């Protein structure tokens, strides 16, 4: 029996879900409220209600070899970190290559998703949609929610006394598009996340003065890592993940802080996190430290209160004559079409098994794709989630008991608070999470077997970048080109920067990095053992 699956949203997670449904012989129907695919990465010159919004100058934080769909590498000449136009070009090309567009109903808003009266038997859902004022209802065998979590802005105005008296402009970062209108102005950005830092750095070229107010600080990383290679090609590896999770906590914490401070000392710039050992997702910005050095951006603590024209900070200092306050304070996840009983929340924590399945449903026919966050790329994460979810919907894979799922959720919540902080309940360890999901569908690489049968590939898989191709080496959805894609990933990385050839291209020497990391680890294990 063909199962009809409703997919809500045609961003990257929606496209991954359509493709996975087709691979499993399911019948997908995707509802997209806008007139195009791409979701977050489809730029519009004005913010639209109910849609994610990005600014004109945004660039990806993951490099192309780490963020592609696992069987569709980016073209060789695409830059490693790309603007929204280039990424949208790739997304459209992927959708056309996989013939996904015909399964999407554009300009269609999902207004209601409810369990049918016989849900405990059939697992079916009633879905109501609206297009051009006309409502329609249909029955679906399963639902995959792919609407993202960058839609509903979080503006904690109640946390800032006096804000209602402030006479200048005040808006969320989702409404920011470009710096032109703020030329010569004095701007306060609240929030030290990716958007806040990008906007502040960009405004600092034309504004009179820019200040960033941060409650807790943040690590700021560069996209350019050791020897000029993309950060994630060296940072997100199985070997590093192994060391991070197996070394004593004191050594792992020291190593993490040392990596974060490799470019500059954060305490000297006012950026140092209150708890520097938390693995909270860092900010990626190549320009912010230079703008601080040049004096065009200043970092300040939390705002104590506002006056009509100024902000008074908790350290007693004041920023006067403010023209604009931009809240780069993140987003809240919300599903207005969904009854609150479907995705339950405890103490502001989402109770989803592996960040995907509500554990209490009688039938496993509902999945949320793309909600979890990690220090890794979104596209391969959503691709793997969708592959597992569609196998669960089809019945090829089964979920454990409610008790087992709740115990897993409780355990993850405790670990996440320890590793990522109280507020980062959706964060996860990228390599560990990807391997966990891959193991459910038989797609996790067998490293030991690879070392015995294909040592050249094994070295790249374990010590090199944990690139998406690894999760198409075996199992359902296996891609015959995965091995070659892994062995040639550095060629595609170096291609767009090699526009003036001055010698042989230098790929990173895996064993040099291995030796360096291994030596450091041994030295500190020895020191640790001497001290205990």
From Swiss-Prot:
Segments traversing the membrane: 512-532
Enzyme class: oxidoreductase
Cofactor: FAD
One GO cellular component, as annotated: endoplasmic reticulum membrane
Gene Ontology molecular function: albendazole monooxygenase activity; flavin adenine dinucleotide binding; hypotaurine monooxygenase activity; N,N-dimethylaniline monooxygenase activity; NADP binding; trimethylamine monooxygenase activity
Domain of life: Eukaryota
EC number of this enzyme: 1.14.13.148, 1.14.13.32, 1.14.13.8
Function: Essential hepatic enzyme that catalyzes the oxygenation of a wide variety of nitrogen- and sulfur-containing compounds including drugs as well as dietary compounds. Plays an important role in the metabolism of trimethylamine (TMA), via the production of trimethylamine N-oxide (TMAO) metabolite. TMA is generated by the action of gut microbiota using dietary precursors such as choline, choline containing compounds, betaine or L-carnitine. By regulating TMAO concentration, FMO3 directly impacts both platelet responsiveness and rate of thrombus formation.
Protein name stated in the entry: Flavin-containing monooxygenase 3
């Amino acid at each position: 029996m063909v199962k009809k699956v409703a997919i809500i949203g045609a961003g990257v997670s929606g496209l991954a879900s359509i493709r996975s449904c087709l691979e499993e012989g399911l019948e997908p129907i995707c509802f997209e409220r806008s007139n195009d695919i791409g979701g977050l990465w489809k730029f519009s010159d004005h913010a639209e209600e109910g849609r994610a919004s990005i600014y004109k100058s945004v660039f990806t934080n993951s490099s192309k070899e780490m963020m592609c769909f696992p069987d569709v590498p980016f073209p060789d000449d695409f830059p490693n970190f790309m603007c929204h136009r280039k990424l949208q070009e790739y997304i459209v090309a992927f959708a056309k290559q996989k013939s996904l567009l015909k399964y999407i109903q554009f300009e269609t808003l999902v207004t209601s998703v409810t369990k049918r009266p016989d849900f405990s038997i059939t697992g079916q859902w009633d879905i109501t949609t609206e297009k051009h004022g006309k409502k329609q209802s249909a029955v679906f065998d399963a639902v995959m929610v792919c609407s993202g979590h960058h839609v509903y802005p979080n503006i904690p105005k109640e946390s800032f006394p006096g804000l209602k008296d402030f006479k200048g402009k005040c808006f969320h970062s989702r409404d920011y598009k470009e710096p032109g209108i703020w030329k010569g102005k004095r701007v306060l950005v609240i929030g030290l996340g990716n958007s806040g830092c990008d906007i502040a750095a960009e405004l600092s070229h034309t504004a009179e003065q820019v200040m960033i107010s941060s409650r807790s600080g943040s690590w700021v990383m560069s996209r350019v890592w050791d020897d000029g290679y993309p950060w994630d090609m060296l940072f997100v590896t199985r070997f590093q993940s192994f060391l991070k999770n197996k070394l004593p906590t004191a050594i792992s914490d020291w190593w993490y802080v040392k990596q974060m401070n490799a470019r500059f000392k954060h305490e000297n710039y006012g950026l140092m996190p209150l708890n520097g050992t938390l693995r909270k997702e860092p900010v990626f910005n190549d320009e912010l430290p230079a703008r601080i050095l040049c004096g065009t951006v200043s970092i300040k603590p939390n705002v104590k209160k506002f006056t009509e024209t100024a902000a008074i900070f908790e350290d007693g200092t004041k920023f006067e004559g403010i023209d604009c306050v931009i809240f780069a304070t993140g987003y809240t996840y919300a599903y207005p079409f969904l009854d609150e009983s479907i995705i339950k929340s405890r103490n502001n924590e989402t109770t989803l098994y592996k960040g995907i399945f509500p554990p209490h449903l009688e039938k496993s026919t509902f999945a949320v794709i793309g909600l979890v966050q990690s220090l890794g790329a979104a596209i391969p994460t959503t691709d793997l989630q969708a592959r597992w979810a569609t196998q669960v919907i089809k019945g090829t894979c089964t979920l454990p008991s409610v008790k087992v799922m709740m115990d897993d959720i409780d355990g993850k919540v405790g670990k996440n608070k320890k590793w990522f902080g109280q507020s980062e309940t959706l964060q996860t360890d990228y390599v560990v999470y990807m391997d966990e999901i891959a193991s459910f569908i038989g797609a996790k690489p067998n490293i030991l077997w690879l070392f015995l049968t294909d040592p050249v590939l094994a070295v790249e898989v374990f010590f090199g970048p944990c690139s998406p191709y690894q999760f198409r080496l075996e199992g359902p959805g296996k891609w015959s080109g995965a091995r070659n894609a892994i062995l040639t990933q550095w060629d595609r990385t170096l291609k767009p920067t090699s526009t003036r050839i001055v010698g042989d291209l230098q790929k990173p020497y895996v064993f040099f990095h291995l030796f360096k990391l291994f030596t450091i680890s041994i030295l500190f294990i020895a020191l640790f053992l001497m001290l205990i």
